[in-house]
Amino acid sequence: MYNEHLVVKDSKIGSKGVFTTVRIPANIPIFEVTGTVYSENELPDPNHPALLQVGPNTFIGPSGDVDDYINHSCDPNCKMHVVGNRAIVYSLYVIPAGSELTFDYSTTSTDEQDKWSMECKCNSNKCRKLISGFQYIDPATQREYIRKNLVPLYIAQPNLIKKRD
């Protein structure tokens, strides 16, 4: 993996972000999210910004490492690959050296569990302005994300795909 080639530094998206110091090829694992796994009822701080949902009621907490700083983008260059209670960040395409690594936070979140939303600051051409649970993304984007295998099975299930209110 690429852990030794990642640095945390100031970001235009969030206060800090994860950047690569080398070119990263397409479709490869970059790093694993390594925090403690919690059930929804065990979360020490349910509002911590570094929580990552990895199952309907399962979360990975902050690790104190680079994975705590990966920012959101509505046009991401990475995806979060979730298998069981493990989450690994993969490149979606070739990522040039010096680039910030991002993934779409909505691809791992179901609003039924964490009931959160936040203002988006990615400034991409695809910016949705608000980040929230997967079911609130427009249906065309939901289908694209599912087709490209960008969402874990607990989210891709047809009963979770709903139109926005």
For the regions a protein language model found, what residue spans apply to each?
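Catalytic cores of histone-lysine modification enzymes
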Residues: 1-83
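C-terminal SET catalytic tail plus cysteine-rich post-SET Zn-binding segment of SAM-dependent SET-domain
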Residues: 74, 79-165
